[in-house]
Regions:
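Short, compact, well-ordered microdomains
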Residues: 50-85
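N-terminal non-globular leader segments, chiefly Sec-dependent signal peptides
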Residues: 1-40, 45-49
Length: 85
């Protein structure tokens, strides 16, 4: 079976920390986002190429290579990405 490696692409991302950086996330994506409250969680709704996805506190919001935005769980983000200069 052929194997493939991800191309080294530098991305922009911001970790969603909840209400405290909601405005920073909105500036990053360039528009106001809907924030829902589920119990004590503050969940963001993000328009992606595949439709609406939810971002929970702790998730990273990533700007993709086509300028699209999508959420990524922190454990996946940390396995996939490392800081770039």
């Amino acid at each position: 079976m052929p194997k493939y490696r991800k191309k080294p692409v530098v991305i922009e991302a911001v970790q969603y920390l909840g209400k405290q950086n909601y405005q920073d996330i909105c500036k990053f994506v360039g528009k106001e986002l809907t924030m829902e409250y589920m119990d004590t969680e503050q969940i963001l709704t993000i328009e992606t190429l595949e439709g609406e996805l939810k971002a929970n506190k702790g998730d990273y919001i990533i700007k993709g290579v086509q300028g699209e935005f999508y959420p990524c769980k922190p454990d996946i983000f940390e396995k996939t990405y490392e800081p770039a200069e």
